[in-house]
């Protein structure tokens, strides 16, 4: 019975991963309605989630997991989240309402284009667009409305919703003449609350898990602590990316105004911009980091297999180069921040340069104690600067889109990119694990990967679900199966398999484990780059 439940749970999860991958491709080729009909809203998709949940709970109980409070809490939190999603699917409604200034109506349209009626009236008093000073770049969209017959007046804007009698209203779009507004309407009195309760339980359990005794994480950590390899990987932590869907027109102008990239309002900013434009492309820097990273990587693999340490002159010389790279990155990021007035949280160029900044900083802080951080850190810095160098020759510095002006942006983005960076370290560690001939070295590197994977998966989970909260606050849907969020979920599930070596025997084999972590990183690449470049969705602005 226990074995049957185990295979049902993990088997259903594997099929769900395959279905979600296929769904994002079908959506690109055939459109969103077809993807929802064939996959996301299909009976098979729902049944598979139910099978994975029920079989998983039975297996956990039979395995004795309830005795481990926080481990059980992680899984119960996921069950609560899925329960909330089911309630939303069965009983929640959403749609849109079109208003013209001075018009009163109770009629709106559901997402499936079915007419519906509100139990009250709503009137648009005025609609306006605020712009960044000196530009035609939208800063915010505002709808002043009144709920009738009581006459409650409210203002709806980006990240500022209206709630009335169990309904929530969000700024979604507007008419070309500026005299009309389109509001998203959501009515889900139970599903959101249940889902949020699951998010909270999951967060508390993820924190508590690191203090729980005799978990696979604690055992791997103890083994890693006894060797001179890279416990340092655990400490590496960078920043930005995103994972929630945005309705069309929400916070993104349909036509960009033909304006200067940014209005530089002082002589100091003009001079800073000239310096920034002269040094912003890190071509020499990425080539140096990649070359040094590859050399140190090969040297590290040889030394680990022979149980020897890095020569001191190699470590200190590499640290000097890391310091120069860090100073360069600090200057570029600082100039960009000063000129734009916006932190480096949005855009591929910002993301890649900030990842490189954290990578070089980690080398400086940790290389004396954990030498393996040098090859992995240089490789990450090199690859991320390579990607940054392939962005536009003159990276535009633009104000944030209205929907991105949220305090949740930096937290969401930082947690997602921290997880992606840690997954990158695990992938490089996996390559080294396959390269070294010693079985003992392979096992040790597997332990290093496990120590990194737990916080990486938890950060990805936290960032994804925080993005869901942000989406619900901003446009009324905490999960809309946008390709970006779907691939974030796929990545989460793919990496979750690596944390279940106790139940899945292949993951106890170091060669299989290292090979799997390399394959799994492809999911990260698809999530961040593939969705933007190939699959589309509303995250391509990132």
What are the functions of these language-model segments?
Residues 1-542:
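Solvent-exposed, non-transmembrane regions of integral membrane proteins
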């Amino acid at each position: 019975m226990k074995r049957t439940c185990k295979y049902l749970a993990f088997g259903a999860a594997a099929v769900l991963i395959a279905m979600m991958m296929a769904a994002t491709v079908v959506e690109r080729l055939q459109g969103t309605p077809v993807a929802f009909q064939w996959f996301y809203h299909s009976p098979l998709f729902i049944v598979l989630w139910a099978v994975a949940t029920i079989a998983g709970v039975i297996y956990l109980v039979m395995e004795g997991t309830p005795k481990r409070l926080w481990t059980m809490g992680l899984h119960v939190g996921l069950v609560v989240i899925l329960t909330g999603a089911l309630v939303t699917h069965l009983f929640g409604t959403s749609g849109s309402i079109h208003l013209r200034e001075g018009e009163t109506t109770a009629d709106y349209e559901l997402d499936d284009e079915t007419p519906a009626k509100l139990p009250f009236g709503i009137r648009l008093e005025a609609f306006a667009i605020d712009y960044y000073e000196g530009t035609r770049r939208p800063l915010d969209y505002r709808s002043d409305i009144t709920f009738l017959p009581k006459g409650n007046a409210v203002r709806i804007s980006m990240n500022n919703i209206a709630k009335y009698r169990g309904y929530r209203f969000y700024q979604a779009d507007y008419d070309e003449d500026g005299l009309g507004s389109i509001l998203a309407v959501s009515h889900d009195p139970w599903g959101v609350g249940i889902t949020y309760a699951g998010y909270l339980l999951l967060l508390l359990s993820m924190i508590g898990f690191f203090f729980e005794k005799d978990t696979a994480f604690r055992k791997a950590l103890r083994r890693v602590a006894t060797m001179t390899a890279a416990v340092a990987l655990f400490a590496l932590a960078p920043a930005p990316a995103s994972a929630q869907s945005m309705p069309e027109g929400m916070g993104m102008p349909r036509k960009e105004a033909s304006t200067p990239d940014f209005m530089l309002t002082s002589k100091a900013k003009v001079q800073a911009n000239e310096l920034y434009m002269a040094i912003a492309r890190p071509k020499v820097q990425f080539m140096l980091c990649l070359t040094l990273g590859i050399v140190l990587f090969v040297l590290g693999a040889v030394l680990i297999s022979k149980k020897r340490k890095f020569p001191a002159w190699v470590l200190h010389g590499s640290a000097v180069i890391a310091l120069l790279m860090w100073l360069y990155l600090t200057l570029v990021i600082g100039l960009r921040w000063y000129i734009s007035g916006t932190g480096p949280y949005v855009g591929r160029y910002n993301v890649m340069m900030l990842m490189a900044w954290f990578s070089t900083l980690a080398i400086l802080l940790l290389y004396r104690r954990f030498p393996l951080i040098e090859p992995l850190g240089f490789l990450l810095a090199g690859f991320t600067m390579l990607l940054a160098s392939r962005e536009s020759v003159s990276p535009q510095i633009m104000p944030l889109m209205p929907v991105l002006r949220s305090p949740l942006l930096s937290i969401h983005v930082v947690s997602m990119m921290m997880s992606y960076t840690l997954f990158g370290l695990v992938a490089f560690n996996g390559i080294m694990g396959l390269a070294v001939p010693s079985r003992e070295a392979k096992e040790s590197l597997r332990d290093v990967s496990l120590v990194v994977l737990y916080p990486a998966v938890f950060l990805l989970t936290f960032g994804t679900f925080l993005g869901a909260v942000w989406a619900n606050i901003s446009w009324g849907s905490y999960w809309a199966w946008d390709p970006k969020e779907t691939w974030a979920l796929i990545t989460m599930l793919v990496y979750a398999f690596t944390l279940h070596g106790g139940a899945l025997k292949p993951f106890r084999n170091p060669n299989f484990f290292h090979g799997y972590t390399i394959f799994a990183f492809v999911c990260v690449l698809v999530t961040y780059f593939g969705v933007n470049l190939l699959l589309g969705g509303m995250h391509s602005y990132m």
